Amino acid sequence: MPAELRRLAVLLLLLSARAALAQPWRNENYERPVDLEGSGDDDPFGDDELDDIYSGSGSGYFEQESGLETAVSLTTDTSVPLPTTVAVLPVTLVQPMATPFELFPTEDTSPEQTTSVLYIPKITEAPVIPSWKTTTASTTASDSPSTTSTTTTTAATTTTTTTTISTTVATSKPTTTQRFLPPFVTKAATTRATTLETPTTSIPETSVLTEVTTSRLVPSSTAKPRSLPKPSTSRTAEPTEKSTALPSSPTTLPPTEAPQVEPGELTTVLDSDLEVPTSSGPSGDFEIQEEEETTRPELGNEVVAVVTPPAAPGLGKNAEPGLIDNTIESGSSAAQLPQKNILERKEVLIAVIVGGVVGALFAAFLVMLLIYRMKKKDEGSYTLEEPKQANVTYQKPDKQEEFYA
């Protein structure tokens, strides 16, 4: 190393000496051509740039400047160690940065797994709700005897599954309303159904009701198995067609859990309650008649008879084959009735009559007042003396006493 440094120092000294000798010699002998009369002074170039442009006598002194450039190239040898040291620094900086990033993903993965485990039970609860919806939809076709024969087999299979959840069976009657309601109503009903399920989970109640459901399902399977297929049959006009559609509907329904689990029948009671206000508008006569029909075949079930009244509006919809979507039609009919019969209402008629009378009296009063004023003007009640008196009273404040005051 000391030998190399010495060589570099010697080279630098030689180059500096050459440059020092060349520059004064150039300054003494080399002169730039000057044009006093021309525009030579107007050149925008600086002194350094003019040296390159004006070559003078063409003696080629510029070669010595190239020698200076060689000196610069020699300096690159000394700067070689500098990038090596600089290269080491970013490496050290990058290493500590890489370690924390590696640690964070490991920590993040563990909580994600735990959260996924928590979400799994929630997902399992969600499919149970649609199964209740499907089961609750089709209990209403109790009138046709053919449907009862087809559903007896399904009831026998479901008895095993319903032992734990038999508390909900009592409420299966109101499920008939869901067929006609659109999917929006069914969703709302499912939310309420979940809330009711929690109170029914008490152990003593389930043990008593399970026995009742098993006995009920085999003989009186008419209402419960019907609940599964009826969403498809609700749109069909005749009850005979509903019986034919019963076997096909359970297969089409996406939640397969509906035939297996009958706890959805609790939810059906809530669904029927939701549907009562929506469907009550269009037809009240048919609904009342069919309420009795639904309660009579299901009287064999002890608890079912209590729930039947809320389910009646759904049955009324079934009685009318022409109305496929009663919920939408009921809303439209309710909105149209007030528009058509606004004048027929007693309140509106009374308001119109009273308003007309008051308006007529007010108009008559205005007319009488105008007539009265016109008569006074014609009689000359307004004399010319009155304005004179007014002028006199107006001149009083012009007195000096009042002015000073």
UniProtKB/Swiss-Prot annotation:
Polar residues bias (residue ranges): 202-237
Region (Disordered): 31-59, 134-159, 191-301
Primary residence: membrane
Residues that span the membrane, as ranges: 348-372
Topology feature Cytoplasmic, residues: 373-405
UniProt-annotated site: Cleavage of ectodomain, residues: 346-347
Organ and tissue specificity: Proximal chondrogenic central core of embryonic limb buds where cartilage differentiation is being initiated.
Record GO biological process: cell differentiation; cell migration; chondrocyte proliferation; growth plate cartilage chondrocyte proliferation; positive regulation of substrate adhesion-dependent cell spreading
Subcellular location: Membrane
Extracellular side: 23-347
Keyword annotations from UniProtKB, A to Z: Developmental protein, Differentiation, Glycoprotein, Heparan sulfate, Membrane, Proteoglycan, Signal, Transmembrane, Transmembrane helix
Ranges of compositional bias, category Low complexity: 191-201
PTM statement from Swiss-Prot or TrEMBL: O-glycosylated within the Thr/Ser-rich region which could interact with lectin domains on other molecules.
Function of the protein: Cell surface proteoglycan that may bear both heparan sulfate and chondroitin sulfate. The multiple functional domains provide potential sites for mediating the adhesive cell-matrix interactions and cytoskeletal reorganization involved in limb chondrogenesis. Interaction with other matrix ligands as well as phosphorylation and shedding of the ectodomain might be involved in cell shape changes that occur during chondrogenesis. Furthermore, shedding of the ectodomain might break the adhesive interactions that promoted condensation, thus facilitating the deposition of cartilage matrix molecules.
Protein family (similarity comment): Belongs to the syndecan proteoglycan family.
Protein name: Syndecan-3
Organism field: Gallus gallus (Chicken)
